[in-house]
Amino acid sequence: MKQYSKTISTSFDFLDNFRLAKTDDERYNLLLEEIDDTDVDDYHGNIEQLLFNYDYGHGTIQNVEITDGEVSKDGKGVLNVEFEVYYYFGCDDYNRTDEDNMQIGVSINFKNGEITITGVEEQERLPDEY
């Protein structure tokens, strides 16, 4: 089994505001803002970069959206993510888009100021038979 994760450095403001939040909804909204504000490059956000690690059978992911989730005061939670997998078959001049989703685990390390997002476990691909 293989599982991918990504660690995101956070700001001290985020950690302070998270600790002061009174409800799980407030904490959830703060988490979403922090993940969106810490894009690693100009093209792909943190969730997308985590999803790129998984095998979609020659498909590429697009239109990633966090649909809901929850996070508790201790910094543990989940995010439900929906996305599309786009396939282009050049030889047939044909394309297809499938909808998919993944539940992503969230863990905030208050001491180190980091958020770790973790995808689902998947079977490792077996070698092709000859």
Predicted regions and their residues:
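A short hydrophobic beta-strand element
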Residues: K73-Y87
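N-terminal trafficking/processing presequences and adjacent post-cleavage segments
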Residues: M1-Y56
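Residue-level signal for secondary-structure boundary sites
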Residues: Y87-F89, N112-E114, R125
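A short, amphipathic edge element
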Residues: D55-D68
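Short beta-strand micro-motifs enriched in acidic
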Residues: S107-K111
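Short, solvent-exposed aromatic-acidic interface loops
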Residues: I117-Y130
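Beta-strand-rich solenoidal segments
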Residues: M102-I104
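Short, cysteine-centered beta-strand-loop-beta hairpins and adjacent loop/turn segments enriched
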Residues: E84-D98
